[in-house]
Amino acid sequence: MENLNTKDEKVMNGKFEDEKYSFDDLMNIIRRLRAKDGCPWDREQTHESLKQCLIEEAYEVIEAINNQDYRNLCEELGDVLLQVVMHAAIAEEGKEFTIEDVIGGECKKMINRHPHVFGNLEVKDSQTVLSNWEEIKQKEKKYENISDSILNIPKALPANIRAEKVQKKAAKAGLEFESYDQVLGKVYEELEELKEARKIGQKSYVEEEFGDLMFSIVNLSRFLHVNAENSLTNATNKFINRFVGVESFARQEGKHLWEMSASEIDTLWGRVK
Protein backbone atom coordinates (compact mmCIF):
# COMPACT_ATOMS: atom_id res chain seq x y z
CA MET A 1 0.00 0.00 0.00
CA GLU A 2 1.26 3.45 -0.86
CA ASN A 3 1.10 6.77 0.97
CA LEU A 4 0.64 5.30 4.42
CA ASN A 5 1.40 7.38 7.47
CA THR A 6 3.05 5.87 10.55
CA LYS A 7 -0.24 4.76 12.09
CA ASP A 8 -1.45 3.28 8.81
CA GLU A 9 1.76 1.27 8.57
CA LYS A 10 1.29 -0.07 12.10
CA VAL A 11 -2.28 -1.10 11.35
CA MET A 12 -1.37 -2.68 8.03
CA ASN A 13 1.46 -4.61 9.68
CA GLY A 14 -0.75 -5.89 12.48
CA LYS A 15 0.78 -3.84 15.32
CA PHE A 16 -2.29 -3.30 17.44
CA GLU A 17 -0.92 -2.66 20.93
CA ASP A 18 -2.75 0.11 22.81
CA GLU A 19 -4.00 1.74 19.63
CA LYS A 20 -7.13 3.82 19.26
CA TYR A 21 -8.66 3.05 15.91
CA SER A 22 -10.65 5.12 13.46
CA PHE A 23 -12.97 4.34 10.58
CA ASP A 24 -10.04 4.81 8.19
CA ASP A 25 -8.10 2.18 10.13
CA LEU A 26 -10.91 -0.33 9.64
CA MET A 27 -10.99 0.42 5.93
CA ASN A 28 -7.23 -0.07 5.68
CA ILE A 29 -7.40 -3.36 7.60
CA ILE A 30 -9.95 -4.70 5.11
CA ARG A 31 -7.83 -3.50 2.19
CA ARG A 32 -4.87 -5.33 3.72
CA LEU A 33 -6.91 -8.51 4.17
CA ARG A 34 -7.97 -8.37 0.53
CA ALA A 35 -4.49 -7.60 -0.80
CA LYS A 36 -2.63 -10.22 -2.86
CA ASP A 37 -0.68 -11.35 0.20
CA GLY A 38 -3.69 -11.00 2.51
CA CYS A 39 -6.23 -13.52 3.80
CA PRO A 40 -7.38 -16.20 1.32
CA TRP A 41 -10.93 -16.21 2.72
CA ASP A 42 -11.35 -12.44 2.63
CA ARG A 43 -9.92 -12.28 -0.89
CA GLU A 44 -12.52 -14.80 -2.11
CA GLN A 45 -15.53 -12.84 -0.88
CA THR A 46 -17.91 -11.09 -3.26
CA HIS A 47 -21.09 -9.03 -2.89
CA GLU A 48 -23.01 -12.24 -3.54
CA SER A 49 -21.14 -14.45 -1.07
CA LEU A 50 -21.52 -11.93 1.76
CA LYS A 51 -25.31 -11.57 1.52
CA GLN A 52 -26.04 -14.19 4.18
CA CYS A 53 -23.36 -12.75 6.47
CA LEU A 54 -25.02 -9.33 6.35
CA ILE A 55 -28.43 -10.81 7.16
CA GLU A 56 -27.07 -12.85 10.07
CA GLU A 57 -25.15 -9.91 11.53
CA ALA A 58 -28.22 -7.68 11.32
CA TYR A 59 -30.28 -10.26 13.21
CA GLU A 60 -27.57 -10.56 15.85
CA VAL A 61 -27.88 -6.80 16.40
CA ILE A 62 -31.63 -7.24 16.88
CA GLU A 63 -31.03 -10.11 19.30
CA ALA A 64 -28.69 -7.95 21.39
CA ILE A 65 -31.28 -5.15 21.46
CA ASN A 66 -34.06 -7.57 22.43
CA ASN A 67 -31.88 -8.89 25.26
CA GLN A 68 -30.88 -5.36 26.29
CA ASP A 69 -27.30 -6.61 26.08
CA TYR A 70 -25.65 -3.33 25.20
CA ARG A 71 -22.09 -4.55 25.61
CA ASN A 72 -22.80 -7.19 23.00
CA LEU A 73 -24.72 -4.63 20.92
CA CYS A 74 -21.51 -2.63 20.57
CA GLU A 75 -19.73 -5.69 19.19
CA GLU A 76 -22.58 -6.67 16.87
CA LEU A 77 -22.84 -3.16 15.44
CA GLY A 78 -19.14 -3.45 14.68
CA ASP A 79 -19.83 -6.67 12.78
CA VAL A 80 -22.50 -4.92 10.71
CA LEU A 81 -20.09 -2.07 10.04
CA LEU A 82 -17.54 -4.65 8.92
CA GLN A 83 -20.01 -5.91 6.33
CA VAL A 84 -20.53 -2.37 5.01
CA VAL A 85 -16.78 -1.84 4.75
CA MET A 86 -16.26 -5.21 3.06
CA HIS A 87 -18.81 -4.41 0.37
CA ALA A 88 -17.29 -0.96 -0.09
CA ALA A 89 -13.81 -2.46 -0.46
CA ILE A 90 -15.04 -4.97 -3.03
CA ALA A 91 -16.79 -2.18 -4.94
CA GLU A 92 -13.68 -0.02 -4.75
CA GLU A 93 -11.60 -2.80 -6.33
CA GLY A 94 -14.14 -3.15 -9.13
CA LYS A 95 -14.29 0.63 -9.59
CA GLU A 96 -18.05 0.50 -8.85
CA PHE A 97 -18.06 2.99 -5.97
CA THR A 98 -16.03 3.91 -2.90
CA ILE A 99 -16.76 4.17 0.81
CA GLU A 100 -16.72 7.94 0.32
CA ASP A 101 -19.55 7.52 -2.18
CA VAL A 102 -21.51 5.48 0.37
CA ILE A 103 -21.05 8.05 3.14
CA GLY A 104 -21.55 11.03 0.84
CA GLY A 105 -24.74 9.60 -0.60
CA GLU A 106 -26.18 8.96 2.85
CA CYS A 107 -25.26 12.44 4.08
CA LYS A 108 -26.95 14.05 1.08
CA LYS A 109 -30.02 11.86 1.61
CA MET A 110 -30.33 12.79 5.29
CA ILE A 111 -29.97 16.50 4.55
CA ASN A 112 -32.44 16.38 1.67
CA ARG A 113 -35.03 14.41 3.63
CA HIS A 114 -34.88 16.68 6.68
CA PRO A 115 -35.82 20.09 5.24
CA HIS A 116 -37.34 20.98 8.62
CA VAL A 117 -33.82 20.79 10.11
CA PHE A 118 -31.54 21.82 7.25
CA GLY A 119 -34.04 24.08 5.49
CA ASN A 120 -36.95 26.37 6.25
CA LEU A 121 -39.81 23.86 6.27
CA GLU A 122 -41.97 23.83 9.40
CA VAL A 123 -43.50 20.60 10.71
CA LYS A 124 -46.09 19.90 13.40
CA ASP A 125 -45.05 16.45 14.58
CA SER A 126 -43.19 13.25 13.72
CA GLN A 127 -46.07 12.02 11.56
CA THR A 128 -45.64 15.07 9.34
CA VAL A 129 -41.93 14.29 9.16
CA LEU A 130 -42.71 10.75 7.93
CA SER A 131 -45.16 12.05 5.34
CA ASN A 132 -42.58 14.54 4.06
CA TRP A 133 -39.95 11.78 4.01
CA GLU A 134 -42.14 9.59 1.77
CA GLU A 135 -42.95 12.50 -0.53
CA ILE A 136 -39.29 13.44 -0.91
CA LYS A 137 -38.36 9.79 -1.45
CA GLN A 138 -40.97 9.51 -4.21
CA LYS A 139 -39.37 12.46 -5.99
CA GLU A 140 -35.82 11.14 -5.50
CA LYS A 141 -36.74 7.73 -6.88
CA LYS A 142 -38.83 9.32 -9.65
CA TYR A 143 -41.85 7.22 -8.73
CA GLU A 144 -44.82 8.28 -10.84
CA ASN A 145 -47.46 6.50 -8.76
CA ILE A 146 -48.07 4.33 -5.70
CA SER A 147 -47.58 1.19 -7.79
CA ASP A 148 -43.97 2.20 -8.48
CA SER A 149 -43.42 2.58 -4.75
CA ILE A 150 -44.97 -0.81 -3.95
CA LEU A 151 -43.05 -2.58 -6.72
CA ASN A 152 -39.79 -1.26 -5.26
CA ILE A 153 -40.35 -2.71 -1.79
CA PRO A 154 -37.49 -5.26 -1.50
CA LYS A 155 -38.64 -8.82 -2.18
CA ALA A 156 -35.87 -10.07 0.12
CA LEU A 157 -37.60 -8.65 3.21
CA PRO A 158 -39.12 -11.12 5.70
CA ALA A 159 -42.61 -11.94 4.40
CA ASN A 160 -44.48 -10.40 7.35
CA ILE A 161 -42.57 -7.13 7.09
CA ARG A 162 -42.97 -6.92 3.32
CA ALA A 163 -46.71 -7.61 3.57
CA GLU A 164 -47.14 -4.86 6.15
CA LYS A 165 -45.22 -2.34 4.03
CA VAL A 166 -47.33 -3.18 0.97
CA GLN A 167 -50.55 -2.83 2.98
CA LYS A 168 -49.52 0.53 4.42
CA LYS A 169 -48.69 1.97 1.01
CA ALA A 170 -51.93 0.63 -0.46
CA ALA A 171 -53.85 2.15 2.46
CA LYS A 172 -52.36 5.57 1.73
CA ALA A 173 -53.75 5.28 -1.78
CA GLY A 174 -57.22 4.59 -0.36
CA LEU A 175 -57.27 0.79 -0.64
CA GLU A 176 -58.12 0.07 2.98
CA PHE A 177 -60.75 -1.62 5.13
CA GLU A 178 -62.95 0.77 7.06
CA SER A 179 -62.96 -1.07 10.37
CA TYR A 180 -61.44 -3.79 12.51
CA ASP A 181 -64.59 -5.89 12.09
CA GLN A 182 -64.17 -5.86 8.31
CA VAL A 183 -60.57 -7.00 8.63
CA LEU A 184 -61.49 -9.75 11.08
CA GLY A 185 -64.25 -10.84 8.72
CA LYS A 186 -61.66 -11.11 5.94
CA VAL A 187 -59.53 -13.36 8.15
CA TYR A 188 -62.50 -15.70 8.70
CA GLU A 189 -63.27 -15.60 4.97
CA GLU A 190 -59.71 -16.62 4.09
CA LEU A 191 -59.81 -19.37 6.72
CA GLU A 192 -62.93 -20.84 5.13
CA GLU A 193 -61.28 -20.69 1.71
CA LEU A 194 -58.28 -22.54 3.14
CA LYS A 195 -60.58 -25.25 4.48
CA GLU A 196 -62.13 -25.64 1.04
CA ALA A 197 -58.69 -25.81 -0.58
CA ARG A 198 -57.68 -28.56 1.83
CA LYS A 199 -60.76 -30.57 0.85
CA ILE A 200 -59.75 -30.30 -2.79
CA GLY A 201 -56.27 -31.46 -1.80
CA GLN A 202 -54.21 -29.62 -4.42
CA LYS A 203 -50.99 -28.49 -2.71
CA SER A 204 -50.47 -25.33 -4.78
CA TYR A 205 -54.05 -24.25 -4.07
CA VAL A 206 -53.65 -24.91 -0.34
CA GLU A 207 -50.41 -22.91 -0.31
CA GLU A 208 -52.08 -20.02 -2.14
CA GLU A 209 -54.99 -19.88 0.29
CA PHE A 210 -52.68 -20.24 3.28
CA GLY A 211 -50.73 -17.25 1.96
CA ASP A 212 -53.95 -15.26 1.66
CA LEU A 213 -54.79 -16.12 5.26
CA MET A 214 -51.35 -15.01 6.43
CA PHE A 215 -51.65 -11.76 4.48
CA SER A 216 -55.02 -11.04 6.09
CA ILE A 217 -53.60 -11.76 9.56
CA VAL A 218 -50.80 -9.26 8.96
CA ASN A 219 -53.48 -6.78 7.96
CA LEU A 220 -55.33 -7.54 11.19
CA SER A 221 -52.15 -6.81 13.15
CA ARG A 222 -52.09 -3.31 11.66
CA PHE A 223 -55.61 -2.63 12.87
CA LEU A 224 -54.68 -3.99 16.30
CA HIS A 225 -51.60 -1.73 16.30
CA VAL A 226 -49.26 -4.65 16.98
CA ASN A 227 -46.19 -5.75 15.04
CA ALA A 228 -46.84 -9.07 13.29
CA GLU A 229 -43.15 -10.01 13.18
CA ASN A 230 -42.62 -9.29 16.88
CA SER A 231 -45.85 -11.06 17.82
CA LEU A 232 -44.82 -14.25 16.03
CA THR A 233 -41.31 -14.06 17.49
CA ASN A 234 -42.72 -13.70 21.00
CA ALA A 235 -45.14 -16.58 20.45
CA THR A 236 -42.27 -18.77 19.22
CA ASN A 237 -40.16 -17.85 22.25
CA LYS A 238 -43.08 -18.66 24.54
CA PHE A 239 -43.49 -22.07 22.93
CA ILE A 240 -39.76 -22.79 23.26
CA ASN A 241 -39.76 -21.87 26.95
CA ARG A 242 -42.78 -24.08 27.59
CA PHE A 243 -41.28 -26.97 25.64
CA VAL A 244 -38.07 -26.72 27.67
CA GLY A 245 -40.18 -26.75 30.84
CA VAL A 246 -42.18 -29.81 29.72
CA GLU A 247 -39.02 -31.73 28.86
CA SER A 248 -37.49 -30.74 32.20
CA PHE A 249 -40.51 -32.11 34.10
CA ALA A 250 -40.36 -35.31 32.03
CA ARG A 251 -36.69 -35.82 32.86
CA GLN A 252 -37.43 -35.27 36.55
CA GLU A 253 -39.81 -38.21 36.25
CA GLY A 254 -37.09 -40.25 34.53
CA LYS A 255 -38.84 -40.21 31.16
CA HIS A 256 -38.24 -39.04 27.60
CA LEU A 257 -40.96 -37.15 25.77
CA TRP A 258 -41.05 -39.64 22.91
CA GLU A 259 -41.84 -42.39 25.44
CA MET A 260 -44.86 -40.56 26.85
CA SER A 261 -48.47 -40.55 25.70
CA ALA A 262 -50.16 -37.45 24.34
CA SER A 263 -52.25 -37.13 27.51
CA GLU A 264 -49.15 -37.32 29.73
CA ILE A 265 -47.42 -34.60 27.71
CA ASP A 266 -50.59 -32.52 27.81
CA THR A 267 -50.60 -32.77 31.61
CA LEU A 268 -47.00 -31.54 31.77
CA TRP A 269 -47.84 -28.76 29.32
CA GLY A 270 -50.57 -27.61 31.67
CA ARG A 271 -48.06 -27.47 34.53
CA VAL A 272 -45.65 -25.16 32.69
CA LYS A 273 -48.40 -23.06 31.15
Predicted segments — roles?
Residues 1-76, 82-210, 214-273:
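Flexible "arm" and connector segments at domain edges
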